[in-house]
Swiss-Prot record:
One of its GO terms (molecular function) is argininosuccinate lyase activity. It is an enzyme of class 4 (lyase). One of its GO terms (biological process) is arginine biosynthetic process via ornithine. It comes from Prochlorococcus marinus (strain MIT 9211). Keywords: Amino-acid biosynthesis, Arginine biosynthesis, Cytoplasm, Lyase. This is Argininosuccinate lyase. The lineage of its organism: Bacteria, Bacillati, Cyanobacteriota, Cyanophyceae, Synechococcales. GO terms for cellular component: cytosol. It catalyses: 2-(N(omega)-L-arginino)succinate = fumarate + L-arginine.
Length: 462
């Protein structure tokens, strides 16, 4: 079937340019959304009397027939059409004859594709939110089992203070919750209908934009037709939000990679989620977190590509917009695959080495801050206490011992405020339990955090 504009041109399009210009191989992914938007548009044309009710009904039946053919694999991306819109229109004309040519009345591909993308992305945001909730629940399950499991806490990748493993894991629940909140905010801006803006200036026909918006469950319509067809802010926002999801997944991946190394040995990778080496038989490689860490760069790249693509575009529609779809599509696939792979890894692929974690928090100076706090409780100014503890640590390092190994005379020589109870204050359990500030790693505080998360997920079920 010839192109709609062929009567305007004297010669056909160069074959390579035709292929270069086509987008059907990737925008066919929007078929269901294109059919949904077209059905809403056909109903509106019938409601407003632009076409009669019988014609509107026949158009809807034809569009549903195409949907059926697609589900059977008969109607697919192997169409001699530039894009999904023309593929649908061509097939509709084959099914209905001249009536099929009426579907595009009062509509342009410009507002059509803008509508399709929003419908598709709205659904994908919900799917990603589900994936995020799932990984949160898996992390929460680990946290519930490890309230009293202690792990070294780090700053600058140097041991700093011991923390509850549950507290550490709950930090990622917080990150993923912010990701979910951002997606909800993005969805609120995705959920605005551009349908009816036509090419850029609206239409002279008496269309009803509010009706089509309601049919497609949009919450509002664009108030400026130029903005409606040229706005891709929502796509940038979505990929930016997705980039932060990948940042958080990458940070978690980095920790799992460290933890599974011989140098840390905080976790063991199970055979279900690890691979081996082709030459080194002893190896068990953390491929899943490494891949997730690597894939974050893809999403960051899509964000940069979209920003650069948009920055110099005049109003309204430009063919450059064709480049937004592959960035969006691949972002969704990458984020969902990464979330699902990490969820499987967390649920089935790693085991915490409790003995190793226990020995790790007993073998360093991460209790030094508590010695300073002890002196502060004895009315020693903090900065003076800090300096005293610094000298104690230096003494221990010189003698090759830990703070707990100092004799009581050595404590007293450093400051008379030290009493026998200093030894109890040095135990990792006491160090962690003493963190009573809201949001801290103290067992009571983490227990409250666990309860808050449990209540949050329970309320979602109701």
């Amino acid at each position: 079937m010839g192109k709609p504009w062929s009567d305007r041109f004297e010669v056909g399009l160069h074959p390579f340019i035709e292929s270069f210009n086509a987008s059907i191989k990737f925008d066919f992914l929007l078929l269901q959304e294109d059919l949904d938007g077209s059905i809403a548009h056909a109903r509106m044309l019938g409601k407003t009397g632009i076409i009669n009710a019988d014609e509107a009904s026949q158009l809807e039946k034809g569009l549903n027939q195409i949907r059926l053919e697609a589900s059977q694999g008969v109607f697919n991306a192997d169409q001699p059409a530039e894009d999904v819109h023309f593929a649908v229109e061509n097939r509709l004309i084959e099914l209905l004859g001249p009536l099929g040519k009426k579907l595009h009345t009062g509509r342009s591909r410009n507002d059509q594709i803008a509508t399709d993308i929003r419908l598709w992305l709205r659904r994908k945001i919900d799917e990603i939110n589900f994936d995020l909730e799932n990984i949160q629940k898996i992390l929460l399950g680990h946290a519930e089992k490890n309230l009293y499991t202690l792990i070294p806490g780090y700053t600058h990748l140097q041991r700093a203070q011991p923390v509850s493993l549950a507290h550490h894991l709950l930090a990622y629940l917080e990150m993923f919750q912010r990701d979910r909140d951002r997606l909800v905010e993005v969805k609120s801006r995705v959920n605005t209908s551009p349908l009816g803006a036509a090419a850029l200036a609206g239409t002279s026909l008496p269309i009803d934009r509010l009706y089509t918006a309601d049919q497609l469950n949009f919450t509002s319509i664009y108030s400026n037709s130029l903005d409606a067809v040229s706005d891709r802010d929502f796509a940038v926002e979505f990929i930016a939000a997705s980039s932060l999801i990948m940042v958080h997944l990458s940070r978690l991946s980095e920790e799992i990679i460290f933890w599974s190394s011989e140098e840390f040995s905080f976790v063991k990778l199970t055979d279900r989620c690890a691979t081996g080496s082709s030459i080194m038989p002893q190896k068990k490689n953390p491929d899943v977190p490494e891949l997730v860490r690597g894939k974050s760069g893809r999403v960051f790249g899509h964000l940069q590509a979209l920003l650069v693509m948009l920055k110099g575009l005049p109003l309204a529609y430009n063919k450059d917009f064709q480049e937004d779809k592959e960035a969006l599509f691949d972002t969704v696939v990458t984020v969902r695959n990464s979330l699902q792979a990490m969820s499987i890894l967390l649920e089935e692929g790693l085991e915490f080495s409790l003995d190793r974690l226990g020995s790790a928090v007993e073998s360093d100076f991460s209790n030094a801050t508590d010695v300073a706090d002890y002196l502060v409780s004895k009315e020693v100014p903090f900065r003076e206490a800090y300096q005293i503890v610094g000298r104690l640590v230096k003494l221990c390092m010189k003698e090759g011992i830990l703070l707990k190994d100092l004799s009581f005379d050595q404590w007293q020589d450093m400051h008379p405020a030290f009493d026998q109870d200093i030894y109890k204050r040095l135990t990792p359990e006491h160090v962690v339990a003493s963190r009573i500030s809201q949001g801290g790693t103290g067992f009571a505080q983490v227990s409250a955090q666990l309860e808050n998360w449990q209540n949050q997920f329970s309320s979602l079920k109701e």
